[in-house]
């Protein structure tokens, strides 16, 4: 009797480590909005997490030059020496942080940096403290790496920022990491030096806890806000802090897929082991382009940030003029995270009662043809995120549609 005759064919069974990870609400909304556009409906999509500017010309030229020089082979595993030197100079110039080249790593986007760090450091059941609202990948990466996300709600009353009291209460002997993002996706909230210091004092008292900071939106801050990163504020924590950044947001290079980080040598070495068996080196062409981005002119960043600030003000003022919505002014990034508690319990023209922020966002999509993302996707309700990385004309039209849709609720 053959094995095939005795073993019944089974369907695919996903590994338990991904059983708690579903399809992202962001992807669901994006897919529905795209389908509606294909049907000819005039949908305005305000869910994109990327700048609407183009990659600077000198960066594109550097990539082209690299291709013509034949720089199309494998590179060093976790970054070319040229890019690591540019990153080292960036950290020193902008953040006052000194790293050796073997304390710097480069990967295929900041998401892979986070994945490498968690995979290299977490044992099953190790805890990672994540303030909510949070970028959706944070908790899923921890789950995949068999860690335990510890979600700490940080609502508008605290400016969507973690407090020292909440951090202290969340730390246990199993805590391995605290993960902070400033400015934040989705809230736009940013930590000043005064906001950070009480948190860093807590971490100094708990030497088993490491800190991962996601600084991806560093250059997109408003109203004279002074960006700082924890390792520059507290040198005593530098040896257990991973400072993550990338070229995607500041330089409009989301598709080039380059993220980087500076941190303790042994952590960086362990992350390289993970990367060696996952993707190996990042794209050689993208790395050459990133050298040009980091070493080249930076003056255009101010103009782009000023454009984002005008759009931020337009959206915040427009949302706060709508009955039932309440929008805090974000310090950075290109998102608003507006409260919508005032519309819960109301009824749509079709007779459906809005019970959650997900219901409200579905109503805006179907009725107003405006795609936004519910706060539940980011771990905090009842809110919704708008990305204002689109034209002012589209934003004005979207705000008019949202206001009209809210007026139709009873």
Curated annotation (Swiss-Prot):
The modification N6-(pyridoxal phosphate)lysine is found at residue 249. InterPro entries: Aminotransferase_I/II_large, AspAT/PAT-like, NHTrfase_class1_PyrdxlP-BS, PyrdxlP-dep_Trfase, PyrdxlP-dep_Trfase_major, PyrdxlP-dep_Trfase_small. It comes from the Bacteria. Its EC number is 2.6.1.1, 2.6.1.39. L-aspartate binds at residues 47, 135, 185, 385. Its cofactor is pyridoxal 5'-phosphate. Keywords: Aminotransferase, Cytoplasm, Pyridoxal phosphate, Transferase. It catalyses: L-aspartate + 2-oxoglutarate = oxaloacetate + L-glutamate; L-2-aminoadipate + 2-oxoglutarate = 2-oxoadipate + L-glutamate. Its main location: cytoplasm. This is Aspartate aminotransferase.
């Amino acid at each position: 009797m053959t094995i095939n005759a005795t073993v019944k064919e089974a369907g695919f069974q996903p590994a338990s480590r991904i059983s708690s990870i579903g399809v992202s609400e962001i992807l669901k909304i994006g897919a529905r909005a795209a389908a509606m556009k294909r049907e000819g409906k005039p949908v305005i999509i305000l869910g994109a997490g990327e700048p609407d500017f183009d990659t600077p010309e000198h960066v594109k030229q550097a990539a082209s030059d690299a291709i013509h020089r034949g720089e199309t082979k494998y590179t060093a595993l976790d970054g070319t020496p040229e890019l690591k030197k540019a990153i080292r100079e960036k950290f020193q110039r902008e953040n006052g942080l000194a790293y050796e080249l073997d304390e710097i790593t480069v990967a295929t986007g900041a998401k892979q940096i986070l994945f490498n760090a968690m995979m290299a450091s977490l044992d099953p059941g190790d805890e990672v403290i994540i303030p909510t609202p949070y970028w959706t990948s944070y908790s899923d990466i921890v789950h995949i790496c068999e860690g335990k996300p510890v979600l700490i709600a940080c609502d508008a009353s605290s400016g969507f920022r973690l407090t020292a009291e909440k951090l202290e209460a969340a730390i246990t002997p199993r805590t391995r990491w605290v993960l902070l993002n400033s400015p934040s996706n989705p809230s736009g909230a940013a930590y000043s030096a005064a906001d950070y210091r009480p948190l860093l004092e807590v971490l100094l008292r708990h030497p088993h806890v490491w800190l991962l900071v996601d600084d991806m939106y560093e250059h997109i801050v408003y109203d004279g806000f002074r960006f700082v990163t924890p390792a520059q504020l507290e040198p005593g924590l530098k040896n257990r802090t991973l400072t993550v950044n990338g070229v995607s947001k500041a330089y409009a290079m989301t598709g080039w897929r380059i993220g980087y980080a500076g941190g303790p040598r042994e952590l960086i070495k362990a992350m390289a082991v993970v990367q060696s068996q996952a993707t190996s080196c990042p794209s050689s062409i993208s790395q050459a382009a990133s050298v040009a981005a980091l070493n080249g002119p930076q003056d255009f960043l101010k103009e782009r940030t000023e454009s984002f600030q005008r759009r931020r003000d337009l959206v915040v003022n427009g949302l706060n003029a709508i009955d039932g919505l309440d929008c805090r002014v974000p310090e950075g990034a290109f998102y608003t995270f507006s409260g919508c508690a005032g519309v819960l319990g109301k009824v749509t023209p079709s007779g459906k009662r809005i019970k959650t922020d997900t219901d409200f966002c579905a109503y805006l999509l179907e009725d107003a043809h405006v795609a936004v993302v519910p706060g539940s996707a980011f771990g905090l309700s009842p809110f919704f995120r708008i990305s204002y990385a689109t034209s002012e004309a589209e934003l004005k039209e979207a705000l008019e549609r949202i206001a009209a849709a809210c007026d139709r609720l009873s």
